Amino acid sequence: RYRSGEINAVECLSQECAALGDVVPGVLETFVGQCDLDAFFPPFVAFCERHKIPVTILSDGLDFYVESLLKKHGLERLPWFANHAKFVSDDGVTKLKPSFPYRSEHCEQCGNCKRNHMLASSADDDTLIYVGDGISDRCAVRYADVVFAKADLIRYCQSQNISFHEFRDFRDVKARMERILQQGRLTPRREARMARRDAFIAE
């Protein structure tokens, strides 16, 4: 229902958390501990840090597992933004309750508006690189100068005539970035710069 647009991210996460019923925090933490990042993400971060390229993680998921995954790989130093979740007790039943501190009234689909984070943290002369794969990335990519896309985001970029580099994992992103830097082609995209300018004017 979320992928079809019938419900948005706030409704989807709220329904998913409610469906968990009585939650045992330790069991949930064990499950999260079994999950992992793209194996090529830590080397990609190291590459970016060597080249003085800041990395920020934007997730429309929940903070407790984002934080867990970053700590698992020693990447908790990275700035990141996600929806919040906490355990609450209700008549002896422990439930996972989500909240959405970064929701935007201008964004109907997402719980964590990635577009707003991009605009708030960038300067006029910055060149923005965006890596994404899903529905929550759609509102952000038009503001990015360099876009890496896979899965659902490829189809969206194609439908909106947004240029992009296709990738399978962060090994592909790193390899492409190496070529872009070697060739001196890390330059602003005119349409993205105009979109950012229009957004700032509208604010």
Could you tell me what each predicted segment is?
Residues 1-84:
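Alpha-helical substrate-recognition element adjacent to the catalytic core
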Residues 59-60, 124-166:
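Acidic, Mg2+-coordinating phosphoryl-transfer loop and its flanking beta/alpha structural elements
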Residues 24, 190-203:
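Non-catalytic pre-domain segments flanking phosphatase-related domains
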Residues 49, 71-74, 122, 142, ...:
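Anion (oxyanion) recognition and catalysis
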Residues 70-128:
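Substrate-recognition "cap/lid" segment bordering the active-site pocket of phosphatases
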Residues 37-41, 114, 134:
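Amphipathic coiled-coil/heptad-repeat helices and related helical stalk/stem segments
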Residues 101-116, 158-191:
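P-loop/Walker A phosphate-binding loop and immediately adjacent motor/lid segment at beta-alpha junctions
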Residues 82-87, 152-156, 169-173:
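Short, acidic/turn-prone active-site loops that include or flank metal/cofactor-
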